[in-house]
Curated annotation (Swiss-Prot):
Family assignment from sequence similarity: Belongs to the GatB/GatE family. GatB subfamily.
Protein name: Aspartyl/glutamyl-tRNA(Asn/Gln) amidotransferase subunit B
MF-aspect GO terms: asparaginyl-tRNA synthase (glutamine-hydrolyzing) activity; ATP binding; glutaminyl-tRNA synthase (glutamine-hydrolyzing) activity
SMART domains: GatB_Yqey
UniProt keyword terms in alphabetical order: ATP-binding, Ligase, Nucleotide-binding, Protein biosynthesis
Protein EC: 6.3.5.-
Top EC category: ligase
One Gene Ontology biological process: glutaminyl-tRNAGln biosynthesis via transamidation
Family matches, as InterPro entries: Asn/Gln-tRNA_amidoTrfase_suB/E, Asn/Gln-tRNA_Trfase_suB/E_cat, Asn/Gln_amidotransferase, Asn/Gln_tRNA_amidoTrase-B-like, GatB, GatB_C_1, GatB_Yqey_C_2, Gln-tRNA_amidoTrfase_suB_CS
Domain of life: Bacteria
Length: 474
């Protein structure tokens, strides 16, 4: 057990999925040719005035509602002054003293324990552009400049990389379930800065924190935190903490698995915040507040409903609500008539178990209606579970219709009791000696009889075979 305690706070930048940018009317589409979606406001040209996007404010209110945070009806935008090539105005429009979203909290589960992580604030700001470094040149793409961001700042309440990842995954699911962001980490819609420090256990003092910048995958976030903790502990134990652990911003080298120094960490005073004179103070009227606080069912609420109403186990309910796509697929199966238990098994075990590489629920070729039909045919006794797996393999490889495949593959079960009884009587008659042994106490022979009936019937319903065979054997 380590003699040190890890202190972690996270700042997450969520790109809001508005159709236009936060302070102008340019499109926010990803992947367009460089500098296509720009205007005088994006470019920071003299005389261009920002106009606040109402939809961005509404989405911020929705997030605050989801985490039970204070919503500040009055807030102010401020200029955050710094120079960087992808920031054409030489300042970023952000919020400082009065953010739209105040204190809230997010509950996580980690290592079979529940913990509440405080959220200090969430404020709106504009994104910067993007620097592209090629050979001896650096290029600037300002398509992303002025895109709306919601920066969510946690309290330093996390004590391990596992807790940090649990918090991030929960936050990721919240913004996805709210529908305020696609939270695509590969495209930069969900980016994280981690603030990491250590201290001897039992010490209440907060020591030097190091910021690790722009992490965009759960895997790399965890590795970056773990490396940084090890680096700081090693420096402490070697007596080099004061010289090697300084307040700075570091980058994570994904190839080497280490963090390296990028620049000294600025304090708020270094940014010289002041209210933006081009933007009026924000007042959230009753109509906008009413729209913002109206949110869909959140992951925790959905999980409780699955447990209490559908009778699912907590673990299974947690798996289904860990992803918006999974939850929607599952509920669509229920709407098509599949049972909760059948939908759960065939979605999470059979279908997901067959997804490999880049194949996803959206690209696997089996939609929720098709899988629900397969589940219903099994539950109706028309086919066996084994046959269902064969059909699912074909569906994923070639597609098709469940009922047509049942017929063409000859997988329909025999459910006619008369036909099954005839086969049972034939098997028992041909094995009279074994029937006598069974009746004298050799119960294991029951499996032999079942096997013979299944073999001779070529597709009898196993459940009915068991029931009718027991009746015949007495």
């Amino acid at each position: 057990m380590s003699a040190y305690e890890t202190i972690i706070g996270l700042e997450v930048h969520v790109q809001l999925n508005t159709k236009t940018k936060i302070f102008c009317f340019c499109a926010t589409s990803f992947g367009d040719e460089p500098n296509k979606n720009v205007c005088p406001t994006c470019l920071g040209l003299p005389g261009a005035l920002p106009v606040l996007n109402r939809e961005a404010v509404k989405k911020a209110i929705s997030f605050g509602t989801a985490i039970n945070a204070t919503i500040n009806q009055n807030s102010v935008f401020a200029r955050k002054n710094y120079f960087y090539p992808d920031l054409p105005k030489a300042y970023q429009i952000s919020q400082f003293e009065i953010p739209i979203v105040g204190r809230g909290s997010i509950e996580i589960e980690c290592n079979n324990q529940t913990k509440t992580i405080g959220v200090t604030r969430a404020h709106l700001e504009e994104d910067a552009g993007k620097n592209i470094h090629e050979n001896n040149y650096s290029k600037v793409d300002l398509n992303r400049a002025c895109t709306p961001l919601l920066e969510i700042v946690s309290e330093p309440d996390m004590r391990s990389s596992d807790e940090a990842i649990a918090y991030l995954k929960k936050l990721h699911s919240i913004v996805r379930f709210l529908g305020i962001s696609d939270a695509n980490m590969q495209e930069g819609s969900f980016r994280c800065d981690a603030n990491v420090s250590i201290r001897p256990k039992g010490d209440c003092k907060l020591y030097t924190r190091v910021e690790i910048k722009n992490l965009n995958s759960f895997k790399f976030i965890q590795k970056a935190i773990e490396y940084e903790v090890e680096r700081q502990i090693e420096a402490w134990e070697e007596g080099k903490y004061q010289s090697e652990v300084v307040q700075e911003t570091r980058l994570f080298d994904t190839a080497k698995g280490i963090t390296r120094s990028m620049r000294g960490k600025e304090e708020a005073a270094d940014y010289r915040y002041f209210p933006d004179p081009d933007l009026l103070p924000v007042f959230i009227d009753e109509n906008l507040m009413r729209e913002g606080v109206k949110i869909p069912e959140m992951p925790d609420e959905k999980r409780e409903r699955y447990i209490n109403t559908l009778g699912l186990k907590p673990y299974d309910a947690g798996v289904l609500t860990s992803s918006l796509e999974l939850a929607l697929y599952f509920e669509s199966m229920l709407e098509e008539g599949a049972s909760a238990k059948g939908a759960l098994t065939w979605l999470t075990t059979e279908l997901l178990g067959r997804l490999k590489g880049e194949n996803t629920l959206q690209t696997c070729g089996v939609d929720s209606k098709t899988l629900a039909t397969l589940v219903k045919r099994i539950e109706e006794g028309k086919i066996s579970g084994k046959s269902g797996k064969e059909i699912l393999d074909v569906l994923m490889e070639k597609g098709g219709d469940v009922d047509s495949l049942i017929d063409s593959m000859g997988l329909a079960q025999i459910n006619d009791d008369g036909a099954i009884i005839a086969v049972i009587e034939s098997v028992l008659s041909a094995n009279a000696d074994k029937v006598a042994e069974y009746k004298s106490g050799k119960d294991k022979l029951f499996g032999f009889f079942v096997g013979q009936v299944m073999k001779n019937s070529k597709g009898a319903n196993p459940a009915r075979v068991n029931e009718l065979l027991k009746e015949k054997l007495g």
